[in-house]
Amino acid sequence: MAAAKWLIASLAFASSGLAFTPEDFISAPRRGEAIPDPKGELAVFHVSKYNFDKKDRPSGWNLLNLKNGDISVLTTDSDVSEITWLGDGTKVVYVNGTDSVKGGVGIWISDAKNFGNAYKAGSVNGAFSGLKLAKSGDKINFVGYGQSTTKGDLYNEAAAKEAVSSARIYDSLFVRHWDTYVSTQFNAVFSGALTKNGDKYSFDGKLKNLVQPVKYAESPYPPFGGSGDYDLSSDGKTVAFMSKAPELPKANLTTSYIFLVPHDGSRVAEPINKRNGPRTPQGIEGASSSPVFSPDGKRIAYLQMATKNYESDRRVIHIAEVGSNKPVQRIASNWDRSPEAVKWSSDGRTLYVTAEDHATGKLFTLPADARDNHKPEVVKHDGSVSSFYFVGSSKSVLISGNSLWSNALYQVATPGRPNRKLFYANEHDPELKGLGPNDIEPLWVDGARTKIHSWIVKPTGFDKNKVYPLAFLIHGGPQGSWGDNWSTRWNPRVWADQGYVVVAPNPTGSTGFGQKLTDDITNDWGGAPYKDLVKIWEHVHNNIKYIDTDNGIAAGASFGGFMVNWIQGQDLGRKFKALVSHDGTFVGSSKIGTDELFFIEHDFNGTFFEARQNYDRWDCSKPELVAKWSTPQLVVHNDFDFRLSVAEGVGLFNVLQEKGVPSRFLNFPDETHWVTKPENSLVWHQQVLGWVNKWSGINKSNPKSIKLSDCPIEVVDHEAHSYFDY
C-alpha cells in the first residue's frame, strides 16, 4: 500500500520553495469525475499520476466520502479501466483490460466495501467501455460502446487479420478525422444483460449492435464522443443514441439525430428529430447532443442547434415524448446561453443543465416545462462544472469541477443553498501548493464592438509594486474561450510562474458571452478579434503599472496560432519581444486540406471554390504582411494534426528562416493538434517557455526560469547563416 500513497491526497505540503513548474503541472495527480452510489454515501473516481523517474503513469480508483470529504483507496489496479455502480447498495461493475480473450475485456463485479472479493461475470470479445446499467425484471440490462465491423460484430483489433496491403481507398469523406485515417470500422452502441444466478451475476458474452442496422450511422461520434452520446431508460428497455444524419455528407454538415431503439434490438433504431420530420421544430437541423431519459422513461431531453453546418451554434433544450407522435417541445429557447449537458431531477419536474457563462462553466436549474423566455437560475458552486450527478434522490448534486487555480474541485451543490466543499486538490496536493483564486481576476475592456473579457493571472508571490513582463495568450477555436477551468495543455498559471503576468483575452468569436459575440467572427477572423486584442493590449499598456508590455510576448494555438501569425504581419507584432504559434494556419488557401469542411465553409461563408476571396482575405502569407515580419517566432506543429497539415508549420518556418527572422521549429511526430504525452509535454514547455524567456528577459530576472538549454533534445542546425546573409 505504501507505493500507492499518492492515490490519497497528502495532508501536508512539501516545502520546495519553488513556484509552479511544468514538472509539478505534469506530475500532479489527475482525477476523474466522481460518481455517487445510489444512496448518496460514497462516490468513486479515477486517479492517475505521472512519474518522471519511472516514466510511467500508474492509476487506480478512489472512494470519496460524501459526508466528510475523506478519500480512501479502492484499488491500485491500473488495468481497471472503468467502474460503475450496479444499483444494488455498494456493489459495483468494473471493466478490466486484461482478459483471457485476446484483445477483449473482462466484466467483473465486486463490492466497494470489499473490492478484493470480486468475481468475473463474463468476457467481451473486444474493446468495450462506457457502461450504463438499469434493472429490468430479474436481469440488469446494460449498454456500452466499441468499434463495429461492417457486419455488425464487435471489432477486435488483436484478432483482426493482417491486411495484404497498406493501401487506403476512399469514395467519400471523411478521409481522415482529427488524428486518424477513417477506416471501415466505426463506433457503435452495443447492448447486453447480466443474469442473476443465486447471489451472483453472469454475462453470456452476447452483444446486440444497436447502431449498425441504420446504414451510415455511428455512435458515439468521433473524435470526442463518449457515453454522453447515448442513454438507457430506467426500466432498461429503451436506448437513445446520437448519430450524425446518416443520409447527409458528414464532412460538410453538422446535422445529427437522436435515435430510439429497443434494448434488445428487436426493431431498427428510428430518429425522433429527423430534419424536416413531422415532430421536429421548423428550421431545426443542426447538431444534437446529450440525450437523457426522464426518470419514468416517458420523455427524453436532448440539446440541439438550429444551423446545419455550424458546430458553435447555440444549443437549445428539447423534450420529446417517447412512443408518441407529438411535436418535440423547445424549452427556454430564448436563453442566450448554450447548454452543454442536461439531466432530470428525480421527480421529473426540474432540469439541471450546465452552460458556459462569462468564462465559467455554471450549473443552472429550470422547470421541465419552462416557456421560451424563462431564464434558468444559477446553482452556487466554485470554479467550473465538468460533470454532476444527483446525490441519492435529493435535489443536491455532486459536482466534479476545476478552475484556473485547481485541477479538481469536488463539492455538493443544492439549489438555493451555499455549496459544500468536499475536496479541493490545491489544498492537498504538494504539486499545486500556493495556487488559489486570489491570483486570478477578470478584466473588461471596450473592444471593437462591445466590452471584451480577459483573465489576469498573476505569479506566485505577486507584488503589485514590481513589474512583470506580459504573457498575452490567445485561445483557439476560434469559437472557444479562456474559461475559469484547468487546462492540461496550455495552463496560464504555468506561464505566470515563470515570472509573467498573463492576460488571456476572450475576443470576438469567444463562447459564453452571448451568441452574437460568438457569431460575429464569421468571415472576420483577422478583423474584430484582432482589433479587440489591440485594444486590450493598449489598455494594459496604458493602465496596468505592474505589467511590462515593452518586454511582453504573445502565444497561441490553433486559431490562436493563426492570430499570432496574423499579428506577426501587423503593427501589434512589433510590440512583442517573441511570438509562439502552435498549430496555426499560415496560407489561406491551405484550409481546404482540413478534415471538417463544415467548419471552414461556415466560418468563411462558402466553399473553397465558391468563396475563395474569403479564404484569401485573412491569408497570413500575403507578401505585404510577410514584409513586416521581424519578431522572433517559435513554430510548433505535429504530424498527426489532421485539422491542419504539418506542412502549414513547415511553410511558416521556411519563410521565417528565409526572411532571417530568429525562429525555431518544434515538431512531435507522434502528437496531434494537442501535445498530451507527458515527456513530450515537458519538452514542449521547455522549448516554448525557454523561447519566450530568452527574448523577454525573464531568464535574466528569474534565475529559476526555464531555459532552452534545459531541454535534453539535440537541435538540428546544419547552417551557420541565413540564406539572405549571402
Swiss-Prot record:
Keyword field contains Signal: yes
Among SUPFAM superfamilies, the record links this protein to: alpha/beta-Hydrolases (SSF53474), DPP6 N-terminal domain-like (SSF82171)
Would you indicate the residue range of the signal peptide?
1-19
A molecular function (GO) held by this record is:
aminopeptidase activity
Q: Which GO terms describe its cellular component?
A: extracellular region
Q: Tell me the Pfam families matching this sequence.
A: PD40, Peptidase_S9
Which UniProt keywords are listed? Aminopeptidase, Glycoprotein, Hydrolase, Protease, Secreted, Serine protease, Signal, Virulence
Q: What class of enzyme is it?
A: hydrolase
Q: Where is the active site?
A: 558 (charge relay system), 641 (charge relay system), 673 (charge relay system)
What compartments host this protein? Secreted
List all annotated glycosylation positions. 96, 252, 485, 605, 699
One GO process term, biological-process aspect: proteolysis
Q: Which parts of the chain are coiled coil?
A: none
Region Disordered: which residues?
A: 269-291
E.C. no: 3.4.14.-
Asked if the record carries the keyword Magnesium, the reply is no
Described function: Extracellular dipeptidyl-peptidase which removes N-terminal dipeptides sequentially from polypeptides having unsubstituted N-termini. Contributes to pathogenicity.
* Recorded family membership: Belongs to the peptidase S9C family.
Know the name of this protein?
Probable dipeptidyl-peptidase 5
What organism is recorded for this protein?
Answer: Arthroderma benhamiae (strain ATCC MYA-4681 / CBS 112371)
The gene is DPP5
